[in-house]
Each structure stands twice: as C-alpha cells, then as structure tokens.
Amino acid sequence: MASSSLANFLSIFTPFKSPPPQPTKAPPSHLSVSTDSSSNNKSAFAPIVTSNNSSSSSSSSSCSGDLMSVVCPSLAYANTLYFRSAYNVQVIVEDNEPEEKLLGRFRREVMKAGVIQECKRRRYFENKQEEKKRKHREAAKRNRRRRGPFRNFNDDKTESVNKKRDDDNDNWEMPEDSPLN
Amino acid sequence: MAKAIPKKGSRGRIGSRKSIRKIPKGVIHIQASFNNTIVTVTDVRGRVVSWSSAGTCGFRGTRRGTPFAAQTAAANAIRAVVDQGMQRAEVMIKGPGLGRDAALRAIRRSGILLTFVRDVTPMPHNGCRPPKKRRV
C-alpha cells in the first residue's frame, strides 16, 4: 500500500522541497485541540475502521506515513496534502461488503462520534440554563449506565463502612497519653 | 471597452471539452439537510461533474426531505456519471438528515466501487452563535 500510494503521489506531486536535514519519524500531528466530545481523536490504526478529526491528515495510513517519512522525506506528508478535508468519521469499504453491513458500520461509527446529536444541539442557540440541564441529563445517563446495576447489592454495606471510618477520623476522644485520661 | 482576452486554444472551447472528460475516480458529496438532499459528483480535486437533488427530481415541499427522495436523487446523479466511465468513488456525507443512509444505499446499489465513506459534517469549535430557538 505504501508503494502504490507513493507511485500515486509521485505522479501528481513533484517533490517541491529539498529533503529536510533531519527526517522526522512521526507524521506531523496536526491534531486540533477541540473541546467537543464528538471530535475524539483516536489515532489507533485499525485496518477496517477509523474515526478521526484531524485538520490535515488521515491517520488511516499512519503506518505507511511512518514508512514514507523514512523512505522519502519530502513526500512523507504528501498524504496530508491530499486529504485536506477534515472528517469526523471515516469508514474504509472492503471489497464485496454487503450493503447492510456497510451501512450498519457507518451508522455505528457516526453514533459513536455523536455527529447527529451534536448537529441537532447546534441548530439553535441554547442559553446557560439549557446547557446546564443538558449536561446534567447527559451525566446522569452516563453514570446511570455504569453504576446502576451494581448499586442495589452493595449499597448498604459500603455506606455503613464509610460512616464508621468517618467517625474514627474525627478525633472525638482525647489522645491516649493525655493527663486527663 | 473591450478587454483583451488572451487567445488560448482551449479557452474558447472549454464548454464542449468538459463534457467529454473521463474520470475513473471521483468523489460523491451528499449534503443531507432536514429539508432536502443534494448529491454532487466531482472529481478528486473538487470540480463538479454533475449534481442532482431531491428537489430537481420532482419532489417538492416536505417530500424532499424523505429518504426515498434522497435515494432517487443519488440514483440520478450516479446514472449521469456512470456512462462517463467512473468506476471508483469516495463518499462524503455532510449534515444530519434522513437522506444520509438512503443515498448511501442507493450509491452502493448502483454498482460503483466505493473506497471510503466519510462524514464531513462541519463542526464549529464553539464559533458563531446559532439563531435563536423557535417558539412553535
């Protein structure tokens, strides 16, 4: 894949800069710092599915990017120039993939990235009150899922133990070597 | 006052030249809003080859936003380029809307080889203030 993409880029781009004095091993991290939860930047190289939000590079070929930065430094980042658009989700289609499977995969990735939710939220302005309410609801939903099923069994036990520990730390009694004892 | 247009051979005939252009690989942009779906087929650089939308397919009003309309729009757009010889394509989907899945399905069914399917919905990093809430 590295060689074919190299050939592709050689035909389109002529090396426009002389090889830099020190070839860097890692591809440039044009990772934009974003506060949104939907634009998570997982740059793990999964051969089938990648979901990314990078401003100039697609890390689906991060592996070949590393290789190319060693082989031909001036063209190592040609990939980043090629895929200039930032995307939220990318799904690489294999050969002869059934239609439903592709759609299911795409939909799942989009849901994981939260694109549609985010879009709906940003359609109209929400004031601070609305935002607080929404965050509260989201937090409740997240915590409920994680801690809900376990709570019913261990609730009383942990609570009582905690209470005891709190009392112990409170220093109600005089220290043992005090003259008053 | 007449501007001196430099005479180049291709300039005068660029209209007819474009229609003959054959592109083996292209990009299909799907813009799926809540009220409509627009499907544009371009080459890899972004120059538009053909486009179609739910509105141009004859649907009007609320029916434009339906997934079936998106399906017909995609089929229309693809039909125009398949005879131009496009085999592989990337798909870029933008916007929320019901047309996303339906158009993707139609593209898949039309027999074009897909390489990537990407979602390029523009996300502000808390930029412009959106319009006020609707009180309906």
Curated annotation (Swiss-Prot), chain B:
Subcellular location: Plastid, Chloroplast
Transmembrane segments: none
Gene3D superfamilies referenced in this protein's UniProt entry, alphabetically: Ribosomal protein S11
Annotated GO MF terms: rRNA binding; structural constituent of ribosome
Pfam families reported for this sequence: Ribosomal_S11
SUPFAM superfamilies: Translational machinery components
UniProt-listed GO biological process terms: translation
Alphabetized InterPro entries for the sequence: Ribosomal_uS11, Ribosomal_uS11_bac-type, Ribosomal_uS11_CS, Ribosomal_uS11_sf
GO cellular component, one term: chloroplast
Assigned keywords, A-Z: Chloroplast, Plastid, Ribonucleoprotein, Ribosomal protein, RNA-binding, rRNA-binding
Domain of life (superkingdom): Eukaryota
UniProt keyword Transmembrane helix present: no
Subunit architecture: Part of the 30S ribosomal subunit.
Protein family: Belongs to the universal ribosomal protein uS11 family.
Protein name: Small ribosomal subunit protein uS11c
Source species of the chain: Guizotia abyssinica
Lineage: Eukaryota, Viridiplantae, Streptophyta, Embryophyta, Tracheophyta
